């Protein structure tokens, strides 16, 4: 056992040869390196698989032998200061390593096909290999200096991957936005590290926790300064894990390739912030005010992310805001002191969200064959619809991921989210109300994404898209907003069934279009003609096996990974592997908990949360299920007429929510107005002052000296008469000055 741990330090460096060799090869032997592109893919997957097996072995050992292993080497800089570096292996490290490697391997397999058409294929795999190395180095670090080093490498890799298509202005701006936003968090993290070192004199986690505890117990530390340092440490995870108010970079990060969106949102960059808070929880837990701040930031992010996801039309941006909300749940759990629940949700969410992003990538890949390689079209859910019969495997995988994120049993996220919701009841009634309400919103917006994408009929070829519905048959907009047109009070099923089948009614316009005499009529949503050839209809097709295989593996994870934390221990049933792994575990809300509940208590706890999720799904189904395929919508439409007295207030509320969501809560606009524009204005003024004033003075003195020299040289000219003239001039000037003064 000890012999095995002696080689744990090599975990971060196993994937490193691939990016190094790719970089050298592309510089020195570009043709040969590009011809061997599949070899580099296989090598990347093979090396990451070795890390996964090693991490899995360590986790199995830790389940049966609860231990923490640390190995540190010291580098003496002088007699007063020495830098220690090493590796730290505990259950958190093992779990994170497994998470990073499993998701990373599947994303690499997926990327082999998804990125095959891209000229930067090898550059992408080099970045991915370095990204995995940086994240593995972060989770195995034994001290804050190593954490900060790999923390910066993770940020650099995300910058490179978000801006992978840097020749396009939008991705270039997105990666700069992510980089600058994370610099704010990184600066706070650095200040916090330096402040803690000033207090404790150590960077090592174990020493740090012990020294801080002793200082607080003996009242030998300034609590205000310690709280400030702890908060500065927390600023880093706020930015990295896209917590309010430093979340603004996350939706723009969707401008990168879809595989990297899956990796960032599942197991790397955003998970890094949650990991660091979990690692430093023994420090935060002795400072109650910091724990409350963590939970407050978490609950704000939970609600904000959910509300911002409501009106998104880009499928990846909708999933990005979903990630933001779920990260808020994890941060809330950590702030409440529910260590196990937070990490459990980190695990289940990682696999579910990776499945959803890879599923969205498969959808986008299929849509690109029709609308072209334009994110504004291929990622727009308005142009989708009716994909069930075209991409059935992708649809099934996406549905499972959606149900999991909604918290529907027995899928993965149900088990972890329900624990967090139950803990919120014990922590604060207000926080519990927000957390439970957001669970309903999550179910609503996730099923909205699913229904807009897969139900109905393909909307790509339809004309005159205006974003509004004026048909008297359909009064719900694409995000669920009721329009102002009046409905026929006596509208029923018979007129619908007797409509002319050779015509179709636009959901957005009153004009009708004849489809074909040979094609069965179907009711469509009309959308703008983007210059496509509408005479020949092409339909999306299912993706290749190398894209589907990772999705199916993630589907299995989504189905079964929740079993590792099922809190049942009755009649010989003992599923709770996670509690064994995290023994002893920090839990401020269940200090005397036995880490299991019986069936009756479990059913009591989950009934309410599942009911809220089902209600959210029901509302989404009512508003987004295609009109012609659901009799329920007829009842809904006829009921709108009865709401005339309340429609004005209802529409104002709907418009407010829509504008809030569509404009990203006005937070981006606030930052742009108060920070970005002012900084740019200051930069322009500074540039003007530097060039016109500072450089003007310097250049002016130089030019003046030059002309004075030239004039002097001309006047002198090696002629005696000129010298006499200058001499007499100086004498006269001197006498004049002397006479007056």
From Swiss-Prot:
<dbReference type="InterPro" id="IPR001750">
    <property type="entry name" value="ND/Mrp_TM"/>
</dbReference>
<protein>
    <recommendedName>
        <fullName>NAD(P)H-quinone oxidoreductase subunit 5, chloroplastic</fullName>
        <ecNumber>7.1.1.-</ecNumber>
    </recommendedName>
</protein>
<feature type="transmembrane region" description="Helical">
    <location>
        <begin position="89"/>
        <end position="109"/>
    </location>
</feature>
<feature type="transmembrane region" description="Helical">
    <location>
        <begin position="258"/>
        <end position="278"/>
    </location>
</feature>
<keyword id="KW-1278">Translocase</keyword>
<keyword id="KW-0521">NADP</keyword>
<keyword id="KW-0793">Thylakoid</keyword>
<keyword id="KW-0150">Chloroplast</keyword>
<keyword id="KW-0472">Membrane</keyword>
<feature type="transmembrane region" description="Helical">
    <location>
        <begin position="425"/>
        <end position="445"/>
    </location>
</feature>
<comment type="subunit">
    <text>NDH is composed of at least 16 different subunits, 5 of which are encoded in the nucleus.</text>
</comment>
<keyword id="KW-0618">Plastoquinone</keyword>
<dbReference type="GO" id="GO:0008137">
    <property type="term" value="F:NADH dehydrogenase (ubiquinone) activity"/>
</dbReference>
<keyword id="KW-1133">Transmembrane helix</keyword>
<feature type="transmembrane region" description="Helical">
    <location>
        <begin position="40"/>
        <end position="60"/>
    </location>
</feature>
<dbReference type="GO" id="GO:0048038">
    <property type="term" value="F:quinone binding"/>
</dbReference>
<feature type="transmembrane region" description="Helical">
    <location>
        <begin position="185"/>
        <end position="205"/>
    </location>
</feature>
<dbReference type="InterPro" id="IPR001516">
    <property type="entry name" value="Proton_antipo_N"/>
</dbReference>
<feature type="transmembrane region" description="Helical">
    <location>
        <begin position="602"/>
        <end position="622"/>
    </location>
</feature>
<dbReference type="Pfam" id="PF00662">
    <property type="entry name" value="Proton_antipo_N"/>
</dbReference>
<keyword id="KW-0874">Quinone</keyword>
<comment type="function">
    <text>NDH shuttles electrons from NAD(P)H:plastoquinone, via FMN and iron-sulfur (Fe-S) centers, to quinones in the photosynthetic chain and possibly in a chloroplast respiratory chain. The immediate electron acceptor for the enzyme in this species is believed to be plastoquinone. Couples the redox reaction to proton translocation, and thus conserves the redox energy in a proton gradient.</text>
</comment>
<keyword id="KW-0813">Transport</keyword>
<feature type="transmembrane region" description="Helical">
    <location>
        <begin position="147"/>
        <end position="167"/>
    </location>
</feature>
<dbReference type="InterPro" id="IPR003945">
    <property type="entry name" value="NU5C-like"/>
</dbReference>
<dbReference type="InterPro" id="IPR002128">
    <property type="entry name" value="NADH_UbQ_OxRdtase_chlpt_su5_C"/>
</dbReference>
<comment type="similarity">
    <text>Belongs to the complex I subunit 5 family.</text>
</comment>
<feature type="transmembrane region" description="Helical">
    <location>
        <begin position="327"/>
        <end position="347"/>
    </location>
</feature>
<dbReference type="GO" id="GO:0042773">
    <property type="term" value="P:ATP synthesis coupled electron transport"/>
</dbReference>
<feature type="transmembrane region" description="Helical">
    <location>
        <begin position="396"/>
        <end position="416"/>
    </location>
</feature>
<dbReference type="InterPro" id="IPR018393">
    <property type="entry name" value="NADHpl_OxRdtase_5_subgr"/>
</dbReference>
<dbReference type="Pfam" id="PF01010">
    <property type="entry name" value="Proton_antipo_C"/>
</dbReference>
<keyword id="KW-0520">NAD</keyword>
<feature type="transmembrane region" description="Helical">
    <location>
        <begin position="720"/>
        <end position="740"/>
    </location>
</feature>
<keyword id="KW-0812">Transmembrane</keyword>
<feature type="transmembrane region" description="Helical">
    <location>
        <begin position="221"/>
        <end position="241"/>
    </location>
</feature>
<feature type="transmembrane region" description="Helical">
    <location>
        <begin position="354"/>
        <end position="374"/>
    </location>
</feature>
<dbReference type="Pfam" id="PF00361">
    <property type="entry name" value="Proton_antipo_M"/>
</dbReference>
<dbReference type="GO" id="GO:0015990">
    <property type="term" value="P:electron transport coupled proton transport"/>
</dbReference>
<feature type="transmembrane region" description="Helical">
    <location>
        <begin position="125"/>
        <end position="145"/>
    </location>
</feature>
<feature type="transmembrane region" description="Helical">
    <location>
        <begin position="280"/>
        <end position="300"/>
    </location>
</feature>
<dbReference type="GO" id="GO:0009535">
    <property type="term" value="C:chloroplast thylakoid membrane"/>
</dbReference>
